[in-house]
């Protein structure tokens, strides 16, 4: 059962606990160049067979999975409007004001959709999957509830063998403060992707996002561990899993499974063999949230492009 907690419930929990015990995870370093610490990241060619080493086939990977292992295909959404918007502002203006707004001049980055470039990136990925000999077709599909990931799933998998994806709350991006991490309500999402399914307990309103606090890397790691536990529990017999999500939560997933850092461009994907161990470990939660002051430690006297004065508090 998913340990699915709203922001309010999480706050209550953190007042009485600084750690949560969840399964320990590990990842294989055998099959993929991205996973091999002996291969410098700069020398990894993940455009060739998604990084699968030449001495192995996809069948080698899947047929040799242990009973507690699965092959995860972790996919980052294509470029969204929130990825390009910050280039129009100074870093301090973006962090202290514009990131919290819904958009500007007709460009919406709140729960951002894909840019034309982002659509093309995912069309290219779709073709790469289609052209990859013996590509292991996922047996279960999971996706973040944000619009850019829902679009990405549709463009990637429509026209390829697939099953109905399950929308997972904890597959979302690091959330809080900035508007790009705030999801639409459940009714909107259903109308946006009517054929998708929601996990049990998915709330109508976004009860996790807050305008005042953002989850820390520590909390993101905890959430990644919960997400993996859910997927392993929901997929006892499936060996190949697809998850469409975001760079922040992907990095947390890699951290939790002991995988080295690997940069993920928009529209990218990384295959990872992940094992769930038969024992638990403690995930610390003593520093679970960042505040607006962490985002904007030195507010400017004014924000470019607005009449806003942070000195007077007007907005």
Curated annotation (Swiss-Prot):
- Which positions are lipidated as GPI-anchor amidated asparagine? 286
Main location class: membrane
Glycan attachment positions: 88, 154, 185
Membrane topology note: Lipid-anchor; GPI-anchor
Q: Which PROSITE patterns match?
A: PG_MUTASE (PS00175)
Q: Which GO terms describe its molecular function?
A: isomerase activity; phosphatase activity
Keyword Endoplasmic reticulum listed: no
Q: Does the keyword Cell inner membrane apply?
A: no
Database matches in InterPro entries: His_Pase_superF_clade-1, His_PPase_superfam, PGM_Phosphatase
Return the SUPFAM superfamilies for the record: Phosphoglycerate mutase-like
Provide a GO CC annotation, any one. Answer: side of membrane
CDD domains, sorted: HP_PGM_like
Classification via Gene3D superfamilies:
Phosphoglycerate mutase-like
User: Where does the protein end up?
Assistant: Cell membrane
Propeptide positions in the record are: 287-315
User: Active site at which residues?
Assistant: 77 (tele-phosphohistidine intermediate), 173 (proton donor/acceptor)
Question: Which stretch is the leader sequence?
Answer: 1-19
Q: What domain of life does the UniProt record list for this protein's source?
A: Eukaryota
List keywords of the entry alphabetically: Cell membrane, Glycoprotein, GPI-anchor, Isomerase, Lipoprotein, Membrane, Signal
One Pfam match, given by its short name, reads His_Phos_1
Family, as annotated: Belongs to the phosphoglycerate mutase family.
In its UniProt entry, what is this protein called? Answer: Phosphomutase-like protein 3
Organism annotation: Candida albicans (strain SC5314 / ATCC MYA-2876) (Yeast)
Q: What is the lineage of its organism?
A: Eukaryota, Fungi, Dikarya, Ascomycota, Saccharomycotina
